[in-house]
Each structure stands twice: as C-alpha cells, then as structure tokens.
C-alpha cells in the first residue's frame, strides 16, 4: 500500500470579539480514493487587543500621569485534537497624553491604543486510526470549532469623568488534510491479472 497525503483544505474565521467561538466546514474524505488512516488539523490566527479611553468631560483632559494607560489580556484559543495557543497582549505604546473633549453633554471623546500579534499557530496535530475509528471524517461535511477566551485588565492614571475599557478580536485560518492508503501499482496489476485468470477459469469450466 502507498500512503498519500491530500492537499490542505482551508477555511477562514473572524471573531469581532473574544469569549466566542467560530465553526468552519470542510469536505469529508472521499472513500473512493482509498483507505483513510489519519486526519491532520492546524490553525493560524491574528489577535488584536484595543484599549479605549473615554472622556465624558466637555473639555480635553490629560491622562497617564504619573502612570501611563494600557490594557493587557491573556487570550487562549483551542480547537480539536488538543490544539491550543495561549498569548499575552499588551496595548503599545502605553499612552500618556490628551484625550479629546466630549462634543456635548451625554457623549464622550475617545482615544484608542491597539496591539496586534499575527501568525499565532497551533499544530499541526494528527489523529491516526482506521476507517472505522475515523468514520466521522468520511463523506459529507466536517465541522471544526475554534474557541477563543480572554482575561485581562486595565491600568493607568485617569482624571475624574474618564474611564477606559478594553476589547479584543481574532481572525485566522483553519487547515485540514487527510492521510490515506491506496494500493501500489504492482499490487493493482497483480489483482487485475488474478481477476482475468479467474474469469478465464470460469469460462473453461462452463464450456
């Protein structure tokens, strides 16, 4: 038997907020190609953390004195087959400066600082088995879910009527491929010869 690896299938996901999940779909393995013996999954993602300072005063204010304003968050992403990444982001540069005034009472001026980390990868991870144990991957559509969670905090010196809050987002690509076996050409030729010989033998017996 010859072992063959399929081309990677890929599907994108985009989470505008964390503490969320995304499910993507892949084509199931075509059993006519051979005997499925393994499935490999990986994902690559970008994460963005944003700290926004809100000024509810109708005049501009200075923040970050004596402690600059920033947010930090630990973002965990998990997927099937034990895929996992843990990444800590801090908004950079830490901010000390002027935040615009609220244009009117009941509204606010704002200033945002962001940090993006790209190319965070988990895997590839392979699960090996037999067509029976990997039956869920054969035919139809296969679902892969990526879960993203974050825990964070904010810090810095803020004057009265000013507050800050952080948010995060994540996007990326999930990849899946199949590992399967096909008969070697020589084996297929012998099998074909065997069928031919069996057919001829049956013809002789019937004549």
Language-model features: where?
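Beta-strand-rich interaction/scaffold domains
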Residues: 64-124
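Short, charged juxtamembrane terminal tails flanking transmembrane helices
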Residues: 204-207
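Beta-strand elements of well-folded, non-transmembrane domains
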Residues: 30, 43-55, 69-81, 121, ...
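Beta-sandwich strand segments
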Residues: 61-62, 82-86, 154-169
